[in-house]
Amino acid sequence: MRILFIADPLEHFKIYKDTTFAMMEEAHRRGHAISFAEAHQLSVEGGRLQVDACDLAVTDERPDWYKLGPKLRQPLTAFSAVVMRKDPPFDMEYLYASQLFTLAEAQGVKVFTSGQALRDFNEKLAILHFPELISPTLISGEAHRLRAFVNQHQDVILKPLDSMGGDSIFRVKPDDPNLSVIIETITWRGKRTVMAQRYIPEIRDGDKRILVIDGVPVDHCLARIPAAGETRGNLAAGGRGEARPLSARDREIAETVGPELKKRGILLAGLDVIGNYLTEVNVTSPTCFREIMDQTGVNVAGLYIDALERRCQH
């Protein structure tokens, strides 16, 4: 197989924990040909999707873990699979890339995750498809509605719809002297829609990342435990990752969401679960492969490449 990875610049990879690197390393180990490009290197000419991509060889050297060939313009149809691994935010450039992927798919290119799914499954809003699994939630940009929600539930998390890694997340209460300015700031004075969720105290025990590959949950999750004094469990916000077997409730959530993900063509998703509640469905570039692999010995990257190979054979 020829696999094109579209991702952020390689020099930014932290390979000791990078999921895209784990995917590349496993694909390379199996003898697949790997190419790399950034999203801005996609183009359309004469109605055909093209990309300025480099062949990539994974090496055993550190820190120089890759070698790149010359940059060549080639059609996306030249690749067995295109794997989109660019990190959020899902801004206009991300939207344009997803639209180009939809055009490519119409020309027979296999894209993971599909352009349509990237557009339809906003990582914060996707949980609304599963109302029975979520804590009380409000989507709004209106200050009076957000304040009323805070007054009703007393302890609330506010977060934007387009962030990642715990960025711009606030925990607020009705008597917070900064509540008004926090609402003004996060909503851009009512010009931006945000999510409000009732605070789930089980975050103290960890915000669990459950990986779902081709509709099937990986048997271990990664509990991301907040640092002292922190509300956020995200590893990017200083949380500590601890691999754990799925609980019965974790599996129930994953097996409820998994079939819908598969139906929509989402090969890989990261479900975020706090306590008994689903809080996010990450589909752009889910992480935590490496942490689970290192702590359990389970080859999560192998499970992903297995699924990719199956999809490309059909």
Swiss-Prot record:
Keyword check for ATP-binding: yes
Reactions accelerated catalytically: gamma-L-glutamyl-L-cysteine + glycine + ATP = glutathione + ADP + phosphate + H(+)
Residues binding ATP, per UniProt: 149-206
Cofactor(s) the protein needs: Mg(2+); Mn(2+)
Pfam families found in the cross-reference section: GSH-S_ATP, GSH-S_N
Residue ranges of domain ATP-grasp in the record: 122-309
Enzyme Commission identifier(s): 6.3.2.3
Superkingdom of the source species: Bacteria
Record InterPro entries: ATP-grasp, ATP_grasp_subdomain_1, Glut_synth_pro, GSHS_ATP-bd, GSHS_N, PreATP-grasp_dom_sf
Keyword Nucleotide-binding assigned: yes
GO molecular function: ATP binding; glutathione synthase activity; metal ion binding
Pathway: Sulfur metabolism; glutathione biosynthesis; glutathione from L-cysteine and L-glutamate: step 2/2
The protein's enzyme class: ligase
PROSITE patterns to which the protein is assigned, alphabetical: ATP_GRASP
Binding residue positions for Mg(2+): E280, N282
GO CC terms of this entry: cytoplasm
Keywords of the record: ATP-binding, Glutathione biosynthesis, Ligase, Magnesium, Manganese, Metal-binding, Nucleotide-binding
Cofactor binding description: Binds 1 Mg(2+) or Mn(2+) ion per subunit.
PANTHER family (alphabetical): GLUTATHIONE SYNTHETASE, RIBOSOMAL PROTEIN S6 MODIFICATION PROTEIN
UniProt record similarity statement: Belongs to the prokaryotic GSH synthase family.
HAMAP family per record: GSH_S
Name this protein carries in UniProt: Glutathione synthetase
Lineage, broadest ranks: Bacteria, Pseudomonadati, Pseudomonadota, Betaproteobacteria, Neisseriales
